[in-house]
Amino acid sequence: MNADKKIAIIIINWKKYDLTLNCIDSVLKSSYKNFKIILIDNEVQNSFPDEINKSEQIKIIKNENNEGFSKANNQGIKYSIKHGVDYVLLLNNDTLIKNDLIDSLIQQSSTLNQKIIQPLILNYDGSKIWNAGGKINNFFGTFQTLEKGKGFKYFKRNRTYTDWFTGCCVLIKVEIFNHVGYFDERFFAYYEDVDYSIRLKKMGYSIALMTNSYLQHYESASSKSLNKIEGNLSPYVHYLNIRNHILLLKKHSKSFNLIGVLLYQLIKILSYLIYFLIRFRFNKFKMVLKGLVDAINFKK
């Protein structure tokens, strides 16, 4: 029986308590009830209301520092495995799930004997696709999000597998972690999901895409810049994106074409530097350079 499967739902909070509470509320309304929320709180100063702290369906793991996405998820995964769950569902705190989402994921996993499944992800108002799977370009070393920005009503549900999953929402059978390992904590945040996807594929696993249910997502709400002069994303996010993309390519260098990778990275980084320079976004300019230097100095 699918209802017998015990699920750990790992949610990481950092700064956006209101979004986290809304996400938890949507999970608690789920038609599937055999779950426990593992809430990893990377925010030091604030605290959750009593109804969250005292809930038997929620376990809060409080960190003294912001441990990032990779390490915080690993904390939740290890706790979950220790407590005998069958599946782990990674879920961003800036999402709202449909009440049948978990049921649908478990059903597809059981029916297809599929161990890793990502659902369809829409933007917050549900009008457009945010993520319908991903495509890896092995020549240039790029990772495309498929169908992003396309109207939901025009979406054709004809794809069943994806090259890489997004850590925004993915269901993983716990046996996978025993075989493949945990997220690489050197990434901190960004590209750790692509890295894990590549490792999965190297070990012979496929990643399914489920499109008969979905969730809605605020994009990168917790990592947006608070400084309007610097634009939407913070300088640190640009640092991580530059550094981690190159780290990933170095880590899996045999999977990509060296000439294509160098050409793409040269154009990409120069474009960022020129754009930030002429827009007087000097903090971002410096962080892109720092990301490049740190990635070059990184040893596999």
Residue ranges and their predicted role:
Residues 137-163:
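Short, flexible, basic/aromatic active-site loop/helix in glycosyltransferases
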Residues 25-34:
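Short, acidic, metal-binding catalytic loop of nucleotide-sugar glycosyltransferases
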Residues 163-172, 176-216:
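A short, conserved alpha-helix in the catalytic core of glycosyltransferases
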